[in-house]
């Protein structure tokens, strides 16, 4: 989509478009960009949503990504946007603080695309893909422990818990056992090594996902603290949005969608009253649901962009009520792995 607002259909690196933003039409319909508006794209990636927002209205976008390579790749789009786009290398959990630091408040909209980008999957050296051999890294930024560090240091019980709670993998225990056995023989430092270990435990049936999908998902979420980041980002958006501002979130698996659904349901719920307490108590709704339930991609998009297959979109509009206390949502996160003492196994 190209309009008189001045950015074309190339990707964020300036070359031919290759990263297809998932559910772009639905995102723009629910975000409803307007002229002179301020919008945050909390997950810039290849810039698909940012470009769509800039094309939809004569507005400004503050785009955030914790991956410095994504920020570097977006330099051409910044130039093309002629002062309407600011890129920031940071975590989207800090979107309210980042907006204030750049004199970009209050916000008229926030969009979040939760999950690994196709750019990261395409780069074997980033260690996200079980289909391309590379170092077992999976870090979206350039700091903190890698997936190889977790595989090397967690014991069998902790590994099984991580793979089950963050990957929803029902074979988590035998997978963890196989990982521990394999690392006793030699360090597991490559994505192909780990994928092969898991593939010996989980058989792939025709038409089903790769056996290592859920294990890799669990490690990626743990390495990048993705669920905690998501909860904090939702709370940050609640604080930063102006009345009437829109929050649009696209998720790709049930753990993320459950958090977003629970958050929006909680924030859109009116205070309850009873015959014992006829005066309703509790905070006023901070959001009004724009999408009644979940929005999913159409069959044409799924056929043309397999990444869209599991996508789910939820959207809400900020009311003029004060933001709710942020600390009431940490119970949405899976329980941490048990602490073990003694010899690692």
UniProtKB/Swiss-Prot annotation:
EC number annotated for this UniProt entry? 2.1.1.199
SUPFAM superfamilies, alphabetically?
Answer: Putative methyltransferase TM0872, insert domain, S-adenosyl-L-methionine-dependent methyltransferases
Reaction catalysed by this enzyme = cytidine(1402) in 16S rRNA + S-adenosyl-L-methionine = N(4)-methylcytidine(1402) in 16S rRNA + S-adenosyl-L-homocysteine + H(+)
Provide the binding site for S-adenosyl-L-methionine.
47-49, 65, 92, 113, 120
The UniProt keywords, alphabetically, are: Cytoplasm, Methyltransferase, rRNA processing, S-adenosyl-L-methionine, Transferase
> Which top EC class is given?
transferase
Q: One biological process GO term for this chain? A: rRNA base methylation
Map out region (Disordered) in residue numbers.
296-345
Q: Which Pfam families match?
A: Methyltransf_5
Q: Where in the cell is it found?
A: Cytoplasm
A GO molecular function held by the record: rRNA (cytosine-N4-)-methyltransferase activity
GO CC: one term?
A: cytoplasm
Q: What family does this chain come from, according to its entry?
A: Belongs to the methyltransferase superfamily. RsmH family.
| Role this protein plays | Specifically methylates the N4 position of cytidine in position 1402 (C1402) of 16S rRNA.
Q: Which HAMAP family match?
A: 16SrRNA_methyltr_H
The name under which this protein is listed is Ribosomal RNA small subunit methyltransferase H
């Amino acid at each position: 989509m190209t309009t008189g607002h001045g950015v074309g259909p190339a990707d964020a690196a300036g070359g031919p478009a290759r990263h297809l933003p998932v559910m772009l039409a639905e995102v723009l319909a629910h975000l409803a960009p307007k002229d002179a508006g301020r919008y945050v794209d909390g997950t810039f990636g290849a810039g698909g949503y940012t470009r769509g927002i800039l094309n939809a209205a004569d507005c400004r976008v503050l785009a955030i990504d914790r991956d410095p390579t994504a920020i570097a790749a977006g330099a051409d789009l910044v130039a093309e946007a002629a002062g309407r786009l600011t890129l920031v290398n940071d975590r989207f959990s800090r979107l309210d603080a980042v907006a204030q630091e750049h004199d970009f408040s209050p916000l008229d909209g926030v969009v979040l695309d939760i999950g690994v980008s196709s750019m990261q999957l395409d780069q074997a050296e980033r260690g996200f893909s079980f289909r391309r051999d590379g170092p077992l890294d999976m870090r979206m930024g350039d700091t903190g422990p890698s997936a190889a560090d977790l595989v090397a240091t967690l014991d069998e019980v902790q590994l099984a818990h991580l793979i089950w709670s963050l990957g929803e993998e029902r074979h988590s225990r035998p997978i963890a056992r196989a990982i521990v056995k394999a690392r006793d023989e030699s360090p597991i430092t490559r994505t192909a090594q780990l994928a092969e270990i898991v593939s010996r435990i989980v058989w792939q049936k025709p038409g089903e996902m790769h056996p290592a999908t859920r294990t890799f998902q669990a490690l990626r979420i743990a390495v990048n603290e993705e669920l905690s980041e998501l909860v904090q980002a939702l709370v940050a958006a609640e604080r930063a949005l102006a009345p009437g501002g829109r929050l649009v979130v696209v998720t790709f698996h049930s753990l993320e969608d459950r958090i977003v659904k629970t958050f929006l349901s909680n924030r859109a719920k009116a205070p309850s009253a009873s015959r014992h307490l006829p005066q309703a108590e509790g905070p006023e709704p901070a959001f009004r649901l724009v999408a009644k339930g979940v929005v999913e991609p159409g069959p044409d998009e799924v056929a043309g962009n397999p990444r869209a297959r599991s996508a789910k979109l939820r959207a809400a509009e900020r009311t003029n009520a004060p933001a709710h206390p942020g600390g009431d949502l940490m119970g949405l996160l899976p329980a941490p792995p048990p602490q073990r003492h003694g010899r690692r196994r």
